[in-house]
């Protein structure tokens, strides 16, 4: 059976890297196999494993950061709470595109949402000794679980695939009722499945978070990228869906990486509700000199981690957020290309007997966006991921994202125009070699 890349090349590299179960191969392991296979074979790979922005950084941010550096900002430490212009811009941005009010004091810059998540985990897990476990609504970003492993915090997970709509509440309550859950974590839109939790589902999450005094960490890394709706007009509905309408127990993690393609500078904001920011918890007060939740997050956790966020990058994010909410910069228009790529890729895969694993948001077809998921009849995740390597296509298995479904995560960010024909040609051979 002929394949575009000889099996011996791929299998040899997999063995060389010590990967015994390809279903559990990490993103960087898959990337390494793909890069080395491409070099050894001379055959171009269609790389779909890395979730890296495939667009230029927003120029308005670059210009503002360069100006800040030229003005001499690099010599001084940034305020641990963040520069006022960014805090104000973040507050206005949240109002403009989410439709909720958070005071500037609760909008705190972080060194990428990764740091925001780490500091949030630290703060949430220490607020109450009885609440020592984080709950993930999976699938999700695997590195967040690694963060908890690094800090020694327990976590539980469930795959939301079979628990959408009215099934979500009872499933959540089965965990929350035990009294040990300090935080609920999910991304919306979701990495890797691209499902978008609906308002009625977010309402259930919010109401249960209030009932069981649990904090919701809403990861908005792919902000406003539900391309089924026009979320691009500031201060006008429809808005980005959020749990913030249904509880005061929330933290919003907003990243500059995907919406503004500003990943390299590691900049984001964590927005803490006004009520939670000022709330006192006995265990936090005892440990941190009587400080309430918000100042513990910033003046203890963030201070200990990095003593602030890059001064010049804060000016970049402030400029991008301000240009967006003033209607001068349509960030949604810039990232729309990811949706177009997903639509074309899905058509090719589905034409050759693949199927979309997470294919619905309740009664509505899933949006096209930065990620989507694929499966192939009769193949496990590991089998499919390895088999596609022989065809010069690389992607990661859903099991690494906490999913219980057999399939792969496909990222659209690195797809180039000439690769659609290439993929069509290779998937035609794949289908012939793997008849169903």
Label each residue range with its predicted role.
Residues 244-336:
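Conserved core segment of the aminotransferase class I/II
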Residues 30, 48, 65, 90, ...:
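Generic structural signal for small/hydrophobic residues in well-ordered secondary structure
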Residues 2, 92, 96, 100-102, ...:
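PLP-dependent enzyme catalytic core of the Aspartate aminotransferase-like
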Residues 311-314, 318, 331-346, 356-375:
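Conserved glycine-rich beta-strand-loop-beta hairpin in the small C-terminal domain of fold type I
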Residues 4-115, 166, 321-324, 328, ...:
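N-terminal small-domain helix-loop-helix segment of the aminotransferase-like
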Residues 272, 374-378, 412-414:
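Short beta-strand-to-loop capping motifs
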Residues 73-212, 217, 223-246, 251:
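Conserved core of the PLP fold type I
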């Amino acid at each position: 059976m002929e394949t575009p890349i000889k099996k011996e090349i791929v299998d040899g590299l997999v063995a060389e890297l010590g990967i015994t179960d390809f279903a559990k191969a990490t993103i960087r392991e898959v990337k390494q196999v793909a890069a080395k296979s491409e070099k050894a074979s001379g055959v171009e790979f269609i790389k779909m494993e890395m979730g890296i922005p495939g667009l230029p950084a927003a120029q308005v941010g670059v210009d503002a950061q360069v100006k800040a550096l030229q003005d001499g900002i690099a010599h001084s430490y940034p305020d641990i709470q963040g520069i006022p212009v960014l805090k104000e811009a973040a507050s206005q941005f949240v109002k403009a595109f989410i439709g909720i009010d958070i005071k500037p004091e609760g909008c705190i810059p972080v060194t990428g949402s990764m740091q925001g998540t780490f500091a949030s985990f630290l703060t949430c897990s220490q607020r109450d000794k009885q609440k020592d476990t984080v709950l993930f609504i999976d699938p999700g970003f695997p590195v967040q679980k690694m963060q908890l492993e690094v800090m020694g915090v327990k976590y539980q997970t469930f795959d939301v695939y079979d628990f959408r709509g009215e099934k979500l509440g009872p499933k959540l309550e089965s965990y929350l009722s035990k009294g040990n859950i300090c935080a609920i974590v999910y991304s919306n839109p979701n990495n890797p499945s691209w499902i978008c939790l609906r308002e009625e589902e977010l309402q259930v999450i919010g109401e249960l978070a209030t009932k069981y005094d649990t904090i919701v960490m809403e990861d908005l890394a792919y902000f406003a990228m539900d391309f089924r709706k026009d979320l691009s007009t500031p201060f006008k509905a429809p808005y980005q869906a959020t749990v913030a309408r249904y509880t005061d127990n929330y933290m919003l993690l907003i990243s500059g990486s995907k919406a503004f393609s500003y990943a390299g500078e590691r900049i984001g904001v964590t927005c803490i509700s006004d009520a939670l920011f000022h709330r006192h918890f006995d265990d936090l007060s005892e440990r941190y000199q009587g400080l309430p939740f918000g100042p513990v997050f910033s003046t203890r956790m963030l201070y200990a981690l990095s003593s602030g966020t890059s001064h010049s990058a804060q000016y970049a994010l402030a400029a991008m957020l301000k240009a967006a909410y003033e209607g001068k910069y349509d960030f949604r228009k810039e990232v729309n290309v990811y949706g177009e790529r997903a639509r074309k890729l899905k058509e090719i895969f589905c034409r050759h007997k693949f199927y979309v694993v997470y294919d619905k948001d309740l009664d509505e077809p899933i949006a096209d966006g930065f990620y989507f998921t694929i499966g192939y009849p009769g193949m496990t995740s590991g089998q499919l991921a390895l088999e596609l390597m022989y065809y010069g296509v690389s992607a990661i298995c859903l099991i690494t994202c906490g999913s219980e479904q057999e399939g792969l995560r496909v990222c659209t960010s690195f797809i180039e125009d000439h690769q659609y024909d290439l993929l069509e040609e290779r998937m035609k051979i794949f289908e012939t070699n793997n008849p169903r």
